[in-house]
Amino acid sequence: MFVGKSVVITGGGSGIGAALARGFAANGAYVCVGDLNEDAAHRIATDVNGVAVACDVRCETDVQNLIETAQKKFGDVDIFISNAGLAKPEPAHAASAANDVWQLNWEVHVMSHVYAARALLPTMIKRGNGHLVNVASAAGLLNQIGDAAYSATKHAAVSFAESLAISHNDDGIDISVVCPQYVATPLIEMSDDTVVSGSLLSADDAAQQILNGIAAKDFMILPHPQVADYCKIRGADHASWLSGMKGLRRKFLRESETGELKDMHNFV
């Protein structure tokens, strides 16, 4: 499916990124793994016979170095997956997160995608092909209760992906945006081998859905297909959707054993 393709993945040291690295390698791709945790990147790169690069996606020169390393090792980048992400739930009300938390969300969830596109688009446009995959979240289509900074920046990530598609599909460049709900990864304080149930997906299951979507050149990739139904409800009657979300928040606050967002998957 991806034989001979050069693939770069940020946040590739764990979670969905690591599962994607394994999936691409199993399908014949050459994989460059970027991660803030250099040891984790090397561990996954060793597993997939790829190359590892320490990369802080908040830093444009780090993203450029990641791309240049992949180009030197494997040639032109065919597929770039902006997967790095974070979650820092707000301490109190919806505007209570500190400015530096908002800025961190912006840099990781939006500007890292901009940096990758800025570095890759000129050569992709010139050769008339390439695929940019921006991992956002269902929160970028709906909302993440208890984390306004995450929700706002994931909405921005979806919008930027739309701008890329509108502007550059005609240049032969494929654009995908990935909007999962809850996946058992370190982002929600779960290990990659967590036993999953209900709406919680394993990283491997999410990665397979993403690989299928990339192969099909889908713009919107929904590892949790029910998200499409929620979006229809939101679009058809926003007031009713807001009412439902407020009800979900009340239920979570009333019934959650910990009150922590890592338990939210039990309520959706």
Q: What do the PLM-derived regions correspond to, one by one?
A:
Residues 2-32:
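Canonical Rossmann dinucleotide-binding motif of NAD(H)/NADP(H)-dependent dehydrogenases/reductases
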Residues 86, 98-114, 129, 157:
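Catalytic Tyr-X3-Lys loop
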Residues 199-200, 204-268:
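C-terminal tail/cap regions
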Residues 38-39, 55-65, 99:
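The beta1-alpha1 cofactor-binding region of Rossmann-like NAD(H)/NADP(H)-dependent oxidoreductases
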Residues 137:
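Residue(s) in the substrate-gating loop at a strand-loop-helix junction
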Residues 27, 142, 163-173:
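Active-site-adjacent segment of SDR/Rossmann-fold oxidoreductases
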Residues 117, 153:
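Active-site helix of classical SDR
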Residues 87-103, 146-149:
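Conserved mid-core segment of classical short-chain dehydrogenase/reductases
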